[in-house]
Amino acid sequence: MKTLGEFIIEKQAEYPEAKGELSGILSSIRLAAKIIHREINRAGLSQDILGVAGSENIQGEAQMKLDVFANETMKKALLAREEVAGFASEEDDNFVAFENDRAKNAKYILMTDPLDGSSNIDVNVSVGTIFSIYKRVSPIGSPVTMEDFLQEGRKQVASGYVTYGSSTMLVYTTGNGVNGFTYDPSLGLFILSHPDMKIPTEGKYYSINEGQYVTFPMGVKKFIKYCQESDEATKRPYSSRYIGSLVSDFHRNLLKGGIYIYPTSTVYPKGKLRLLYEGNPMAFLAEQAGGMATDGFNPILDIKPSELHQRVPFFVGSTSMVKQADKFMQECAE
């Protein structure tokens, strides 16, 4: 039995030049995940943490009370260890520069969706936390700048998510494969339960909000029809599974094989998901697990961000399914 802490130390030992900063950040995330897990598990017992907070994020979306709690928990956990120089969140209008001396001398910045799928909390559906870590590009010792956050996804040094479901799992990559750790609340420890995770090349699930079908581009409509058609050679029809929480849908497809799609639409002409907080970290995980992630045409990780809360269409999952979806998108764009 190997704990997350032991695993982090073991991996750090493989890099003699490593000074432990990244390990410290992962430990901060581990602590934040435990605290968020505790609050989610008692959400049905306390009206103080259920429902709408009465505020909106920069995208104009109503913030749930647990959104605000998770955001502040992540921020405080990172600030306590002083291993990141700055922090950006889907819930904040702008990035936060940590101003104390040790934090300003840190090499890394972190971006997060602190509680993905939070609108599901009130009905006891799985939610998650997503995180993404980069090396800063601004001079060490100075406050972080916007350029530190507007980096292509290929420059990530680590990304991952925590899924709060029937069990709580932390899944992450540092660019050398994907590993999953299940939380044992009796011990207070994350235990390595899913080493070297690989997404099946061929999938059998497609995850998309079909209630928005009439608003989708023709390429997506054709792919949905393709998924629903019978064909023994490709084991179709595929099964439709859509939870409405990116982390939960991605996690199922990572284990079982499938594709998750949130495309452009007449309602969201640029897509709905955020490139920096959702697209890049999940795309990094997908590629490290042997899958693919695109915007329907090009790899997500190659997109150069132009703004902090940039939206992107998102196709992620088993390689064969993403390639097929992209093929329909490209044919309909010609």
From Swiss-Prot:
**Reaction(s) catalysed (UniProt annotation):** beta-D-fructose 1,6-bisphosphate + H2O = beta-D-fructose 6-phosphate + phosphate
Return the CDD domains for the record. FBPase
Q: Which residues bind Mg(2+) 1?
A: E90, D113, L115
Q: Where in the cell is it found?
A: Cytoplasm
What are the coiled-coil residue ranges? none
Which EC numbers does the record give? 3.1.3.11
* GO MF, one annotated term: fructose 1,6-bisphosphate 1-phosphatase activity
Tell me the keywords, alphabetical order.
Answer: Carbohydrate metabolism, Cytoplasm, Hydrolase, Magnesium, Metal-binding
Q: Which cofactor is essential here?
A: Mg(2+)
Q: Where is this protein chiefly located? A: cytoplasm
Q: What class of enzyme is it?
A: hydrolase
One of the record's GO cellular component terms: cytosol
Family membership noted in the UniProt record: Belongs to the FBPase class 1 family.
Task: Describe its assembly.
Answer: Homotetramer.
Q: What is the protein name stated in its UniProt record? A: Fructose-1,6-bisphosphatase class 1
Lineage, please? Bacteria, Pseudomonadati, Pseudomonadota, Gammaproteobacteria, Pasteurellales
